[in-house]
Amino acid sequence: MHKEQLMKLHQFFVYVVKEIMDDNLENTDNECKKLFKIYEMLDIRPHHIHRLKSEQKAAILLLSACVASYLANNMDNVPKNLAKKLEENAFKHLNSCKKNIIILEENENNGESAEKEE
């Protein structure tokens, strides 16, 4: 995909995620909120033309993982592992461009959020 096409796709996913978050904030699951926080921490926006293609791809994959997570929780025919695979691919793209990010993870022991440097 060309960079301009990636930027348009990125903008599309931004609109979709904001629509989901605005209309259904109480129905939006924690996984989607966590992915959107990570996306915001990346500070990669559709209009940032100076960013690498791999960074744009990672942002798109994070947003699409958020959408997939929302759909999996609200529809029966969307597999729940789709969001996880998209999230894994996003981090793979970030690691390929040597981008260090902070990931908010749910601590399995007591439900508190913990910060981890990846």
Curated annotation (Swiss-Prot):
PANTHER family: UPF0058 PROTEIN MJ1205 (PTHR42203:SF2). This is UPF0058 protein MJ1132. Transmembrane segments: none annotated. Belongs to the UPF0058 family. Pfam families: UPF0058. InterPro entries: UPF0058, UPF0058_sf.
